[in-house]
Amino acid sequence: MDKYESDSFRSTFMFREIMEEPETITNTVNSVISDVLRAVNLIKKSKITYVVGSGTSYHAAMIMQIGMLKAGLPAIAVRSSEFSYFTPPDNVGIVVVLISQSGESKDIKDALNLCLKNGYHTIGITNSPKSSISTGTEVSVVTVAGEERSLAATKSHVAQLIVSYLLVSSLNDHGKIEDYIEKCIGIASRIKEIIDRNKDYSDLARGITGRIVFLGDGTLHAEAMEGALKFEETANMITEAYPLGEYLHGPIQVLRGDDTVIILKGRDSREYERLILRLSNFTKNIITIGKGKEFTIPIPECEIEDLDPILYVIPIQILANFKTVCLGLDPDKPTRLTKVVK
């Protein structure tokens, strides 16, 4: 990699904003606690919680849903554009968490208006304190990611995941909020470790070819979907995302020799070894992300499983940025997309 290419990789707003993620976590954690606790009190009184978002925000909603279900709280993650199909006529005990970076996209505002019409309780999680979602919900949790000049959401997504962790952990009542704050601050240093190894990703990015298949289980399935979206948004590449075991139920049939498979290996990925053996029969272009030196991209250890999605998504963001630059494209300004979908 020559100096020009190296500088190009790192001169994008997308990469600079990835670099700001440790600071984003610290600033957000120090800012949102009182509002998170207000949201917790509202959810504790509910019968069911809907978590609504679009694109990257929907992937954060999926992770929040899993956390709430593990805590014994009924929850459903719904895409903003689909929310009207899920709304029950009974408004008693309904809480809707609306997640949006901008707080101004048409679909999320339509979802809020439907909540207000039906009398649902509402919680907003945005990066924009003066947005329609922030000002129109009962409880507003504002992340402190700062302005995102790249169209691809990176640091705002990490901030959403931190808020999700704080909220779900507080609902669990397994510890004091101060303990959760300390764990969040600790994850910032782990992120810095991953970012500091970004030079390792340039050759990997260059070798990504064909269609990209992202595989992950549980919360890492949500981040597999996020990885697929990032490469579609920035690098114009065709992608898919599946749970590990599900990929063997049909989709593997169309895997080609020049396709790339990126596997997010979690703590309980039971299908991992079997899947690697099967995949290696059809493509040699396999990138693994996990905890241990045997993985293509090793992730630092983290004692809190609920924070794993943050660590796994960082290298994917970096790979997407690097691959896009390799292709001669601008990850900050995809030609058909806008930051706020009207």
Identify the residue ranges that each predicted region occupies.
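Flexible, glycine/charged-enriched surface loops at secondary-structure junctions
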Residues: F15, K176-I181, S202-D203, G328-P334
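Accessory alpha-helical/coil subdomains and C-terminal extensions
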Residues: G186-G207, K230
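An N-terminal, well-structured beta->alpha segment
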Residues: K3-K47, S189-D196
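A short, charged, Gly/Pro-tolerant segment at domain boundaries
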Residues: D7, I185-G186, L327, P331-K342
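Conserved phosphate/anionic-ligand binding catalytic regions in large, soluble enzymes, centered on
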Residues: S11-M14, A60-M64, A224-E226, K230, ...
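A cross-family phosphate/adenosyl-ligand binding-site feature
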Residues: D2-E23, I123, E147-S156, C302-V313
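Glycine-rich phosphate-binding loops that contact phosphosugars or nucleotide phosphates
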Residues: V32-K192, D217, I252, T260-I304, ...
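Acidic catalytic cores of enzymes that act on phosphate-bearing nucleotides/polynucleotides
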Residues: I208-E273, R278, F282-N285
